């Protein structure tokens, strides 16, 4: 499948009143190619007290019905918009959706029946503008346990819909509007082709937010993916789940899982061509690969914007007996506070990596002790791999510690991007997880969050 990409740079330098860090501006696109039939907007409402300028209400809408799918939080205290949107997709059988409305600054979580009424009110107000009943998904992000200023929000939905457009600036404003502690808006778009429709240019766009409460099973993470490719409602859930498991469920900032996680995919078919209706078709395989790669690239932006983070770290577990074992080991290492603080301190304390790998697969307290045949200490290898192409630094070889060159280790750990590779030596399966370090700023940001 032919794919087209674009360069990244931007004149955008602020997010609301806050300056975007110079090191993050390179991740903001200056142009984009957006899916046909979709429009987007981001407007200022003032949902969170103290916000006086940053857009905090977003709408993405299609000029025709879409096939749609969603992947949601597994947190038992799921937020009202999650409950509403999950039920709507089930009711509509993943068909006939037209729009997504999103507010930032308030999560509308743990807000009782009133919170569900507020989410419904947001959807119904948007439906009236779109002209279709039961056609709007709802997302919210922000502080938990407080009711939305719902009248203020619904009063601004008509304006948000009226201001929606298909230009790059419209999509960028939309991406800005869903941010909370993010330091930069996260937006991507690409064009691609499918095997059965050579010469037809399809487009996909995605925007996401998240900088804290990020862990597997998603976290305070909202994502909307939109494409003009023709995809049947029946195959939407599986193609999205496959992509999410290998992208948004493979990132960690702090190990906390939020009440509001939502990743939604909308496909309106506006570009034409043959509908992807079978999971056995070459088109399905091609789109699944494209969506997974696209989602992974978008998810990496969240890690790069981790609260207080100074490093982007890839945890790669290879030569595993099973893919699931590799995932669990990678996740355990990526989530370990001891590993993450050592990375911040440029400390080559590989014992912490081994420790996190060693407890990844053991049974929980109160359960029979399992043997964990997937991990054999005398077959395990650990290395630091620099991203500049230079030679990897071996820390552990077949269970035996290496004489580590501390100066070389410090050079690698000083890099903004680095990779930790764990070879289990028990099979041929692998998994990857993306994470960041823990710095002093993480505590400062989260200590001040409600203020």
From Swiss-Prot:
Keywords of the record: Acyltransferase, Amino-acid biosynthesis, Arginine biosynthesis, Autocatalytic cleavage, Mitochondrion, Multifunctional enzyme, Transferase
PTM summary: The alpha and beta chains are autoproteolytically processed from a single precursor protein within the mitochondrion.
Active site (record annotation): 220 (nucleophile)
Subunit (UniProt): Heterodimer of an alpha and a beta chain.
Biological or metabolic pathway of the protein: Amino-acid biosynthesis; L-arginine biosynthesis; L-ornithine and N-acetyl-L-glutamate from L-glutamate and N(2)-acetyl-L-ornithine (cyclic): step 1/1; Amino-acid biosynthesis; L-arginine biosynthesis; N(2)-acetyl-L-ornithine from L-glutamate: step 1/4
Binding site for substrate: 180, 209, 220, 307, 446, 451
GO MF annotations, alphabetized: glutamate N-acetyltransferase activity; L-glutamate N-acetyltransferase activity
Main location: mitochondrion
InterPro entries according to UniProt: Arg_biosynth_ArgJ, ArgJ-like_dom_sf, ArgJ_beta_C
Gene Ontology CC annotation, any one: mitochondrial matrix
Family, per entry: Belongs to the ArgJ family.
Site (Cleavage): residue numbering on this chain: 219-220
EC code: 2.3.1.35, 2.3.1.1
Note, other: This protein may be expected to contain an N-terminal transit peptide but none has been predicted.
Feature type site, description Involved in the stabilization of negative charge on the oxyanion by the formation of the oxyanion hole: 141-142
Protein name: Arginine biosynthesis bifunctional protein ArgJ, mitochondrial
């Amino acid at each position: 499948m032919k794919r087209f990409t674009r360069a990244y740079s931007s004149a955008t330098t602020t997010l609301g009143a806050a300056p975007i860090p110079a090191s993050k501006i390179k991740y903001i696109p200056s142009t984009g190619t957006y899916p046909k039939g979709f429009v987007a907007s981001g407007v200022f409402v003032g949902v969170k007290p103290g916000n006086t300028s940053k857009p905090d209400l977003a709408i993405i809408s299609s000029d025709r019905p879409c096939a749609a799918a969603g992947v949601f939080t597994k947190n038992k205290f799921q937020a009202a918009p999650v409950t509403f949107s999950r039920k709507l997709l089930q009711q509509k059988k993943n068909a006939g959706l037209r729009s997504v409305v999103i507010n930032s600054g308030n999560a509308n979580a743990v807000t009782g029946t009133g919170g569900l009424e507020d989410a419904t009110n947001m959807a119904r107000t948007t439906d009236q503008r779109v002209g279709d009943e039961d056609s709007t998904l709802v997302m919210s992000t922000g502080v938990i346990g407080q009711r939305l200023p719902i009248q203020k929000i619904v009063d601004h939905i008509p304006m948000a819909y009226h201001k929606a457009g298909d230009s790059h600036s419209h999509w960028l404003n939309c991406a800005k509007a869903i941010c909370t502690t993010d330091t930069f808006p996260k937006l991507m778009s690409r064009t691609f082709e499918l095997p059965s429709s050579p010469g037809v240019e399809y487009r996909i766009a995605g925007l996401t937010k998240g900088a804290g409460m990020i862990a597997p099973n998603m976290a305070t993470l909202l994502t909307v993916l939109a494409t003009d490719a023709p995809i049947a409602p029946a195959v939407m859930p599986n193609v999205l789940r496959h992509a999410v498991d290998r992208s948004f469920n493979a990132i960690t900032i702090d190990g906390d899982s939020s009440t509001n996680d939502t990743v939604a995919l909308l496909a309106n078919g506006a570009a034409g061509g043959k509908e992807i209706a079978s999971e056995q078709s070459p088109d399905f395989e091609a789109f699944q690969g494209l969506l997974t790669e696209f989602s992974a690239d978008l998810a990496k932006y969240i890690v790069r914007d981790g609260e207080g983070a100074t490093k982007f770290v890839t945890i790669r577990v290879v030569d595993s007996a099973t893919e699931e074992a590799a995932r669990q080991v990678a996740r355990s290492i990526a989530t370990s506070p001891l590993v993450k603080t050592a990375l911040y301190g440029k400390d080559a304390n590989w014992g912490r990596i081994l420790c996190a790998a060693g407890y990844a697969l053991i049974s929980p307290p109160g359960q029979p002790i399992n043997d964990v045949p997937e991990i054999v200490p005398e077959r395990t290898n650990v290395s630091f791999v620099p991203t500049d192409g230079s030679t990897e630094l071996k820390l552990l070889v077949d269970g035996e510690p290496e004489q580590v060159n501390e100066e070389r280790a410090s050079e690698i750990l000083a890099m903004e991007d680095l990779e930790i590779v764990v070879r289990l030596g028990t099979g041929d399966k692998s998994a990857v997880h993306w994470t960041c370090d823990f710095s002093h700023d993480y505590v400062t940001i989260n200590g001040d969050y409600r203020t």
